[in-house]
């Protein structure tokens, strides 16, 4: 505290705390309560950022909404998001990150959500949590942390979440066989038609309805960076930039979208999926098989784990992929670039710009 005071300008107000992080979190909770805004908290193995983006776009014409920006979704970022909300904010849409047990519980305690949303559960961070059941239990900390009478939105028929559901919550299953399905998107004009993005939109619609908002018309969605945006590159090359994260679920969804939407040759540059635990090799081999089944014409594997993809070309790292790829492409190609964030495949995209 003395050092902070010494470094501060003479006219500055210095708040000293023995535990600055705990103080930041308590300030965020106090401001959340003072705002009186409705809080929607989103987590899941895949799709949480896209779902957050779609939900914020659905709410914006109806309510003064503040949503998580960039990756401010941690024990530091979430309080900063809450504290960034100006007076008069009516809805907070918060993304909750998770890399271990107890983290979702901590973020739920800080944000005190009125609506919880779990997009899905899959083999993500298994290396840290031991099993997919452990992943489900960590995500379900959101369910445990809601106040009685709150709304909880879950994927319909997900057996891994069933033991964690609560009778004193309004549980809304979404997706095939659920209370809301893709049919409920009729009448909405969405700027995407991929299957996984439409499923995210169904979950977002359920959250909007949970707070009394009925979206309509065109939904103007601005997706967060490096999460599946299409970019037109010189030489009539289309790049799908999806470099922020990767796991078996999101890899399959991205490959399925490539199969459905690419009019010309399909090229996939796929890097390592991290934190998959002892089954990592099997997961990577399965993705290689899925890529072939999806009609990928040229498959480039990046990283040691991705050697198991049985690709046409295997390279050690992003720099090698960036050097190789331009020579493999032809006008009209669509290129999917996807890996876990730590692989840095945005460098491949930059090489094509």
What are these regions (language model features)?
Residues 14-19, 313-321:
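Short acidic-hydrophobic, aromatic-tinged amphipathic segments that line or gate anion-handling sites
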């Amino acid at each position: 505290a003395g050092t902070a005071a010494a470094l501060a300008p003479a006219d500055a107000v210095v708040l000293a705390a023995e535990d600055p992080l705990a103080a930041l979190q308590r300030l965020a909770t106090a401001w959340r309560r003072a705002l009186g805004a409705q809080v929607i908290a989103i987590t899941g193995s895949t799709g949480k950022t896209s779902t957050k983006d779609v939900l914020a776009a659905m709410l914006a014409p109806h309510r003064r909404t503040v949503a998580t920006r960039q990756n401010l979704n941690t024990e530091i970022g979430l309080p900063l998001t809450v504290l960034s909300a100006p007076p008069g904010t009516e809805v907070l849409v918060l993304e909750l990150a998770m890399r271990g047990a107890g983290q979702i519980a901590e973020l739920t305690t800080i944000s005190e959500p009125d609506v919880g949303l779990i997009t899905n559960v899959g083999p993500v961070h298994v290396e840290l949590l031991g099993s997919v059941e452990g992943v489900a239990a960590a995500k379900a900390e959101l369910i445990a942390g809601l106040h009685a009478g709150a709304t909880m939105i879950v994927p319909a028929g997900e057996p891994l979440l069933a033991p964690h559901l609560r009778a004193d919550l309004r549980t809304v299953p979404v997706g095939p066989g659920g209370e809301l399905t893709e049919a409920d998107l009729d009448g909405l004009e969405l700027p995407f038609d991929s299957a996984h993005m439409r499923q995210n939109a169904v979950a977002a619609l359920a959250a909007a309805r949970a707070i009394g908002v009925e979206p309509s018309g065109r939904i103007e969605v601005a997706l967060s960076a490096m999460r599946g945006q299409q970019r037109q590159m010189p030489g009539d090359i289309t790049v799908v930039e999806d470099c922020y994260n990767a796991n078996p679920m999101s890899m399959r969804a991205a490959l399925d979208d490539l199969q459905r939407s690419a009019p010309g040759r399909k090229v996939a540059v796929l890097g390592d999926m991290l934190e998959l635990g002892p089954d990592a090799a099997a997961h990577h081999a399965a993705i290689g098989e899925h890529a072939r089944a999806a009609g990928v014409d040229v498959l480039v594997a990046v990283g040691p784990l991705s050697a198991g993809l049985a690709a046409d070309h295997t390279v050690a790292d992003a720099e090698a992929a960036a050097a190789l790829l331009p020579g493999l492409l032809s006008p009209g190609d669509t290129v999917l670039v996807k890996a876990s964030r730590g692989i840095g495949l945005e460098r491949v995209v930059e090489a094509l710009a």
